[in-house]
C-alpha cells in the first residue's frame, strides 16, 4: 500500500501539487489558528468542517449574518515588498467591517488561499496576519482551504478570499431604515488606502511614475511600500462598544466606490448625504496619488476612502456624545456631514462641499 501511495504522490508532485507539503503547512499553523479561538469553538483543526456552539439566550430573535471579500491587487504590493504578514489583517478587515455596519457581532472566519506553488514560509506569514485580524475583530479563525493550483497561478503568486459569519438579534439590525433628515454623519479615520483602488495605485506609482516600493517619499514619511501596505483598520470592537450605549441609525464601510457609491447603499429613498470637505484629515498618500496621477478630485472621492474608513449616522442630539465616545475608545473621529431630504428625484444622493 505504501509503495502505491508513494507512486501516486510522486505523480501528483510531478504535476505540481505537493500533498505532503500541504499537510506540513496545516500542521505548522495549528497553534496560530487555535490562538484565535474563543468560547464556543469546538476544536477540530484539520477536520472536514468547523463547529461553534452559540448561546442564543443573548439573541431572542437570532439572525445569522455572512460576508465575503478579498484584498484585490494589494497582494501585488505584498509580493513587491516580499512582506506577507499584514495582508491577512486586510482580508479580515474587509469582511468584518462589512459585517459590523449591520450591527452584527463576528463569530467565525474562514480563509481561502490559492497558490501556484506552496511556499510554507509565505503562507504561514499570511495566516499569522489573518489570525491577528481575527484577534482584533474578536472572532475565531476556524478553518480554511489551501489550494495549490499550478497552471492557474504562476509560481508563488497567490490569491486570498475571506468568509465571516456573525450574529445579531433581528430587532437590533442596523439597516438605515431609521435614517432621517438632520442626522449627523461621523467619520472614523482610515489608516490610509486600506484595500481598494490598488489597480489605480499601481498604475500611478509604478507604470506612470516609475517609483519603487523601496523609494522613501518625504511627504509620506516612509517608503512607498510601507505606506501602501498599512493594514486596513478593523472597527469591530469600537463599534460594538458604541452600539451598546447609543442608538445608531446607519453605518457605511467606505470601500470601493468611495463616498459616492457607498453612502447611498444605506440611505432610505428620498434622502441624501451632504459632506463638508475639510472637516476630516485627508492622509498625505491621497494627495500624493492625486497629484502624481493627475486624478480629478471627484474621481478620488469615488475610488478611495480619502481618509474615512467607516461612517456612522446618528441623531443630531446624540452626535457629540457618540463622537466623544469613539474618541475615548482611541478613534480619530469627526462630524463630516449630515442627512437631508432630496428636493426631487434628480437630486444627487451624495454631495461633497468644497473646503471654505
UniProtKB/Swiss-Prot annotation:
Its main location: cytoplasm. InterPro entries: PurM-like_C_dom, PurM-like_C_sf, PurM-like_N, PurM-like_N_sf, PurM_cligase. It catalyses: 2-formamido-N(1)-(5-O-phospho-beta-D-ribosyl)acetamidine + ATP = 5-amino-1-(5-phospho-beta-D-ribosyl)imidazole + ADP + phosphate + H(+). Its EC number is 6.3.3.1. Keywords: ATP-binding, Cytoplasm, Ligase, Nucleotide-binding, Purine biosynthesis. The keyword S-adenosyl-L-methionine does not apply. The keyword Ligase applies. Pfam families: AIRS, AIRS_C. It is found in: Cytoplasm. Pathway: Purine metabolism; IMP biosynthesis via de novo pathway; 5-amino-1-(5-phospho-D-ribosyl)imidazole from N(2)-formyl-N(1)-(5-phospho-D-ribosyl)glycinamide: step 2/2. GO terms for biological process: 'de novo' IMP biosynthetic process; adenine biosynthetic process. It comes from the Bacteria. One of its GO terms (cellular component) is cytosol. One of its GO terms (molecular function) is ATP binding. NCBIfam families: purM. Belongs to the AIR synthase family. This is Phosphoribosylformylglycinamidine cyclo-ligase. It comes from Desulfotalea psychrophila (strain LSv54 / DSM 12343). The gene is purM.
